[in-house]
Amino acid sequence: MGQQFTNAEGEQTEIDVAELQEWYKKFVVECPSGTLFMHEFKRFFGVQDNHEAAEYIENMFRAFDKNGDNTIDFLEYVAALNLVLRGKLEHKLRWTFKVYDKDGNGCIDKPELLEIVESIYKLKKVCRSEVEERTPLLTPEEVVDRIFQLVDENGDGQLSLDEFIDGARKDKWVMKMLQMDVNPGGWISEQRRKSALF
């Protein structure tokens, strides 16, 4: 029998008790104080010295910090893991929208999207294979222009939540570009491998 848990969208989901206990054990090991602070979150992702990566991780942290107290407690941790591991596409896109909307006005403008795309490009550069290295990429500005061209239905220069979700559902390229990697395992592994070499 599982525990009822309300996810970010207010829906009841069931989490297995054994799984919840395992998550708690991991949380206590990583955060003996019972709360996860920004500096610990950054350390986990190995981004203390990388400004662009730090901004990306700070945005993720703020999105997981539901009550805005600048810490992630166990319930917020469980909600984050539930989103990452089990979340429906729409929930992940809603969360991604919240991360991208840095000023919290309910819309994403070009400068906000450009900042995120540039950060993601810098983060992902580390993980590109040799074949990918030879494949020319669009510049971050070209990515943002193309996304707005495909997704900004009313042409107001801002993406609403509905435009963001609809655009991602209609176009696979847009989906790939808009859907934030909330489980950047390859990037984390690469960062840890690099730090082990020094």
Swiss-Prot record:
A lipid is attached at G2 (N-myristoyl glycine). InterPro entries: EF-hand-dom_pair (IPR011992), EF_Hand_1_Ca_BS (IPR018247), EF_hand_dom (IPR002048), Recoverin (IPR028846). Ca(2+) 3 binds at D152, N154, D156, Q158, E163. GO terms for molecular function: calcium ion binding; calcium sensitive guanylate cyclase activator activity. Retina and pineal gland. One of its GO terms (biological process) is regulation of signal transduction. Keywords: Calcium, Lipoprotein, Metal-binding, Myristate, Repeat, Sensory transduction, Vision. Pfam families: EF-hand_1, EF-hand_7. Ca(2+) 2 binds at D101, D103, N105, C107, E112. Ca(2+) 1 binds at D65, N67, D69, T71, E76. It comes from the Eukaryota. CDD domains: EFh. One of its GO terms (cellular component) is cone photoreceptor outer segment. Residues 16-51, 52-87, 88-123, 139-174 form the EF-hand domain. SMART domains: EFh. Binds three calcium ions. Undergoes dimerization at low calcium ions concentration, while the presence of calcium ions inhibits its dimerization. Dimerization correlates with its ability to activate GC. Stimulates synthesis of cGMP in photoreceptors. Thought to mediate Ca(2+)-sensitive regulation of retinal guanylyl cyclase (GC), a key event in recovery of the dark state of rod photoreceptors following light exposure. This is Guanylyl cyclase-activating protein 2.
